[in-house]
């Protein structure tokens, strides 16, 4: 360290011009400090170069004396390089490669020969050769706006242009690089301009990197510096130049074969490769790979496919990739600077986030611009709409406003904007004066005022070296040097930018997750046993045992099974089935007898047991009864309807037999279709289909002939034929908690509320066999509801629903009962006529004895079927269908009870008995009107159905207003209502019949009113059946 530098370090003026302000950094061969040019009034960077220890042996005064001018040296140098290349090719350069020291000496001589004599004359002999070589290169470059200018050099000092923004590396590390597309393009364009300029000069940098790119001013003016490794050779054999991460692939011997290693590389192509890496640093702040050879996997991926850059930089836009296509190519011949510039001009965005960053600060900048003073009014000679051009005589430098610069520090932004506003205001309102302007050094700080500092100089206070501390400088961020005794900082000492490895953390995550080995397949998948049993094996045939348990057949060693258990708890008359099989009872019909070999009639029995502590479990225990309780209002299939079986098995024992078809009941031969349907249905084992509840199969008689296990005794109590040919009904009910059975006799009127459901009488002959093993049964669908007081009518004789005798004696065993029966038979035989339908509410409930029907009765092809839907309802009372007040109709369910006759509109209720429903194809059955009804005298074949409900005002409108003790009824004429058929038929019938007068006098409701509702119901049913067919 010389005495001059000691004085300069302590605050003295160097060379009578430069005064030190502060230290900036330490280089590999000197110190860099910030100084003030007292002559030019500007800030400069002073680089002090000291001599290395091993340079003395190659340097001496004798070398300077033998130096020639620059032109001669260049010629000699070229000749020397050619000679050396020729000798290397012929193998005569063994003496030059004898030792590394000798090789280094030859290189030193070659570099020293390149330095011009003017540079050597102004520099000291004690400085290093690299400094002299760099000064010589910069003197050849000249001045350019994007190259750091060499202002002065003398002795061991080099004076260079000061760039207040620091280098690009520090800006990238501080995330101070602007992210707008226009700003990035401005930076990249300046770098390309500088490289293109020096390449046109025949100079190649060979060490382009962010550390060698400086930032000058607030407008992000780029300055390229550090020309120590630059060369003027178009091609070179020296491959050990540059920074590792920015070196092109051809600079690494491992990427070359033996032949390629002997060939020189193009120095211009090396700069283009480094430019592409720097562009990625500016945009993404990362390097694509650490080194461009085979040791880097990222580079290997890139060498195989250039689009691998999208894997490293996922947000890179394709336009930016097009720019890099002419820079980052393995083949140097494909690198083209002109194509890079062309693609850069066509670029719209660098990343997918540019749109966000472009709109980020627009609002703030617009408000700052709006605060500027208005522009002055131009002269009258110039158009008002156009701005006035600056006169050539006025060399005033108008400041430019750059939106592209982005400071992290808000205070810096505000101070810079304030200084700009002040300068702009002074420029607008002050007259340009040439006397106050001076121009220096071909464009460096050309606009300076005598009373103000340069615009590029930061505003801060100057302090002495001994009072060094933090300054108020807000613009420059120099590297502070506080410890003088620290070791020298080498040129490549700063850590390079990082490498993005997007897959590394993902791989580590999966490796760590796998290392824990906590994954268990059973935690995420269903075990095979569960899959087979509950999912795949649900409908297999191997699951029959499971279905039997669900259908209340527990055959597992006669043990109780919770799945097949049924708990009946008395809760407001409703029964609930506990357990998960409740849904199966509701939605699935029970299996047929094909599983157990037993008849469904023996499995599905009815028992009314409301005890809280009683439970029944299939066939698990002897002597126990099986009950299947259904919710009120739910449809019960015929083969699943319950039977009345008392716990003692004394009453209502239903034999196991198949129901006969309709032809057998009526005494005729079955047709071919009926016989075929019967055989086909007998061959089928399982009727376990829930898809069709009311739909019948092929023929019209399938519901009669095809259903096995149908019995007339499904809802029929056990009948006992008395001495007077009267049938008594026995029902077993248990409504008490003590389990006592109450034997109900239909002859007693005290227990009339406990009457059981009895099917309606048939007009055909029905013979009951007292033998328990043999009986002829009819299907449930052929049964019609009757009142709870009614006996089973087994007589085939005519029935007269309208009697003038003492009807009240029917409910008691009086002595004149036989006489009344004889009178009724005679009257019915006289009124007997074919084709008359007996409504359910008009049928007799007394057994008139097993009597041979009249000769004119057709019993072989006709049967009576009830279509009444609400003959038996679930509720609190009987469904009253009003008739005459004095003469009660015995076939009306509610009129037999005098207590209920006073409650009009009440609904009938039979606890625990389901509603009989009309089958889907009921219209296909025989519904011919019989002669033994009230329409025996009529000459029409009208089919009359019973109305569903008559309550409230509707009963009054249809049946007239009831008055106590009055035998008159308000009858309407046939012409005043809608009748299904010709009106003449009904008019003649009611006009020519004398029986309707007696009926109108004896009943409140006329027959015509009965027909209105019946025909309406028939039409509705007929329309439904037509839609279903």
Curated annotation (Swiss-Prot):
Matches recorded under Gene3D superfamilies: Phosphorylase Kinase, domain 1, Transferase(Phosphotransferase) domain 1
SMART domains tied to this protein: S_TKc (SM00220)
Reaction equations catalysed: L-seryl-[protein] + ATP = O-phospho-L-seryl-[protein] + ADP + H(+); L-threonyl-[protein] + ATP = O-phospho-L-threonyl-[protein] + ADP + H(+)
Biased composition (Acidic residues): 56-79
Modified residues (Phosphoserine): 416, 419, 529, 646, 845, 884, 1014
One GO location term (cellular component): cytoplasmic stress granule
Enzyme class: transferase
Residues reported in the UniProt entry to bind ATP: 27-35, 47
Biological processes annotated in GO: G2/M transition of mitotic cell cycle; negative regulation of macroautophagy; protein localization; regulation of filamentous growth; regulation of pseudohyphal growth; regulation of translation in response to stress; TOR signaling
Coiled coil: none
Biased composition (Low complexity): 90-99, 538-570, 734-743
Phosphothreonine PTM positions: 501, 504, 526, 1005
Superkingdom of the organism of origin: Eukaryota
GO molecular function: ATP binding; mRNA binding; protein kinase activity; protein serine kinase activity; protein serine/threonine kinase activity
Subcellular location, principal: nucleus
Subcellular localization: Nucleus
UniProt PTM comment: Phosphorylated by PKA in a TORC1-dependent manner. Phosphorylation at PKA consensus sites RRxS/T decreases upon rapamycin treatment.
SUPFAM superfamilies: Protein kinase-like (PK-like) (SSF56112)
Catalytic residues identified in the record: 207 (proton acceptor)
Positions of the UniProt region annotated as Disordered: 56-105, 377-397, 532-570, 732-824, 949-978
Note: Present with 1270 molecules/cell in log phase SD medium.
Recorded family membership: Belongs to the protein kinase superfamily. Ser/Thr protein kinase family. CK2 subfamily.
Function: May act on PRP20.
This protein's name: Serine/threonine-protein kinase KSP1
């Amino acid at each position: 360290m010389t005495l001059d530098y000691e004085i300069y370090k302590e605050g003295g003026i160097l060379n009578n011009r430069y005064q030190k302000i502060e230290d900036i950094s330490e280089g590999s061969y000197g110190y860099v400090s910030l100084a003030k040019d007292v002559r030019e009034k500007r800030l400069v960077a002073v680089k002090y170069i000291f001599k290395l220890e091993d340079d003395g042996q190659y340097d001496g005064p004798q070398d300077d004396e033998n130096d020639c001018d620059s032109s001669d040296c260049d010629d000699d140098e070229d000749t020397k390089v050619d000679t050396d290349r020729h000798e290397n090719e012929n193998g005569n350069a063994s003496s030059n490669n004898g030792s590394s020291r000798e090789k280094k000496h030859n290189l030193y001589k070659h570099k020293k020969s390149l330095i011009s004599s003017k540079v050597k004359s102004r520099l000291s002999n004690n400085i290093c050769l690299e400094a002299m070589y760099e000064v010589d290169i910069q003197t050849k470059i000249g001045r350019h706006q994007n190259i750091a200018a060499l202002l002065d050099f003398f002795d061991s000092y080099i004076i260079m242009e000061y760039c207040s923004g620091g280098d690009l590396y520090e800006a990238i590390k501080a995330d101070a690089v602007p992210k707008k597309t226009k700003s990035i393009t401005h930076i990249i364009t300046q770098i390309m301009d500088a490289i293109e300029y020096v390449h046109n000069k025949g100079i190649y940098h060979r060490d382009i990197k962010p550390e060698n790119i400086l930032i000058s001013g607030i407008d992000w003016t780029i300055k390229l510096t550090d020309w120590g490794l630059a060369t003027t050779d178009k091609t070179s054999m020296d491959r050990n130049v540059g920074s590792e991460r920015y070196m092109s692939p051809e600079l690494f011997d491992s990427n070359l074969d033996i032949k390629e290693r002997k060939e020189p590389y193009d120095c211009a192509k090396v700069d283009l490769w480094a430019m592409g890496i720097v562009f990625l640093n500016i945009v993404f702040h990362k390097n694509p790979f650490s080194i461009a050879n085979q040791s880097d996997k990222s580079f290997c991926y890139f060498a195989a496919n250039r689009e691998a850059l999208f894997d490293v930089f996922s947000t890179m836009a394709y336009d930016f990739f097009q720019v890099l296509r002419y820079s980052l190519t393995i083949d140097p011949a494909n690198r083209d600077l002109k194509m890079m510039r062309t693609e850069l001009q066509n670029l719209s965005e660098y990343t997918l986030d540019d749109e966000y960053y472009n709109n980020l600060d627009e609002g703030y900048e617009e408000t700052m611009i709006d605060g500027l003073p208005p522009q002055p009014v131009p002269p009258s000679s110039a158009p008002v709409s156009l701005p006035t051009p600056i006169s050539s005589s006025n060399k005033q430098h108008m400041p430019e406003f750059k939106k592209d610069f982005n400071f992290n520090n808000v205070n810096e932004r505000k101070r810079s904007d304030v200084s700009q506003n002040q300068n702009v205001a002074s420029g607008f309102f002050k007259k340009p004066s040439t006397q106050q302007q001076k121009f220096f050094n071909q464009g460096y700080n050309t606009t300076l005022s005598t009373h103000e500092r340069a615009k590029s100089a930061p505003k801060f206070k100057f302090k002495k070296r001994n009072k060094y501390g933090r300054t108020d400088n807000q613009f420059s961020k120099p590297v502070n040097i506080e410890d003088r005794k620290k070791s020298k900082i080498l040129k490549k000492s700063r850590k390079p930018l990082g490498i993005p490895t997007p897959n590394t953390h993902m791989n580590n995550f999966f490796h760590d997750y796998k290392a824990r080995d906590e994954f268990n397949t059973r935690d995420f998948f269903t075990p095979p046993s569960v899959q087979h049993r509950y999912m795949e094996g649900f409908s297999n045939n191997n699951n029959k045992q499971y279905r039997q348990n669900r259908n209340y057949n527990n055959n597992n060693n006669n043990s109780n099974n919770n799945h097949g258990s049924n708990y009946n708890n008395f809760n407001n008359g409703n029964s609930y089935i506990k357990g998960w099989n409740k849904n199966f009872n509701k939605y699935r019909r029970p299996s047929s007898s094909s599983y157990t070999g037993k008849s469904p009639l023996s499995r599905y029995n009815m028992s009314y047991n409301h005890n809280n502590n009683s439970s029944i479990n299939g066939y698990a225990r002897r002597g126990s009864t099986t009950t299947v309780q259904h919710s009120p209002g739910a449809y019960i299939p015929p083969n699943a309807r319950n039977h009345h079986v008392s716990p003692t098995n004394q009453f209502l024992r239903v034999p196991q037999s198949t129901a006969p078809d309709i032809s057998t009941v009526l005494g005729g031969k079955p047709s071919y279709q009926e016989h075929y349907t019967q055989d086909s249905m007998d061959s089928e084992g399982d009727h376990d289909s829930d898809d069709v509840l009311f739909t019948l199969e092929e023929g019209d008689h399938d519901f009669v002939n095809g259903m096995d296990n149908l019995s007339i005794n499904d809802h029929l109590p056990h009948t006992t034929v008395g001495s007077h040919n009267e049938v008594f009904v026995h029902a077993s009910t248990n409504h008490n908690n003590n389990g006592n059975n109450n034997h109900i006799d239909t002859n007693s009127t005290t227990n009339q509320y406990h009457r059981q459901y009895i099917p309606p009488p048939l007009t055909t002959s029905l013979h009951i066999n007292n033998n328990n093993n043999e009986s002829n049964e009819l299907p449930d669908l052929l049964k019609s509801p009757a009142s709870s007081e009614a006996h089973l009518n087994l007589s085939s004789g005519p029935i007269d629903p309208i009697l003038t005798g003492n009807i009240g004696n029917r409910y008691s065993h009086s002595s004149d009962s036989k006489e009344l029966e004889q009178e009724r038979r005679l009257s019915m035989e006289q009124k007997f006529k074919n084709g008359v339908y007996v409504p359910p509410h008009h049928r007799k409930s007394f057994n008139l004895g097993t009597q041979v029907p009249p000769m004119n009765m057709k019993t072989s092809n006709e049967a009576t079927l009830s279509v009444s839907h609400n003959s038996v309802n679930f509720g609190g009372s009987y469904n009253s269908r009003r008739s005459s007040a004095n003469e009660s109709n015995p076939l009306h369910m509610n009129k037999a009870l005098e207590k209920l006759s006073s409650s009009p509109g009440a609904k009938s209720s039979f606890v625990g008995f389901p509603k009989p429903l009309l089958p889907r194809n009921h219209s296909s059955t025989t519904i011919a009107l019989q002669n033994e009804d009230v329409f025996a005298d009529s000459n029409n074949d009208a089919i009359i159905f019973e109305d569903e409900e008559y309550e409230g005002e509707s009963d009054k409108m249809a049946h007239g207003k009831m008055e106590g003790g009055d035998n008159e009824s308000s009858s309407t004429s046939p012409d005043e209502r809608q009748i299904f058929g010709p009106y003449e038929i009904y008019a003649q019938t009611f006009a020519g019949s004398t029986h309707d007068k007696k009926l109108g006098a004896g009943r409140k409701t006329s027959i015509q009113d009965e027909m209105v509702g019946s025909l309406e119901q028939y039409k509705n049913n007929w329309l439904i059946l037509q839609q279903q067919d």
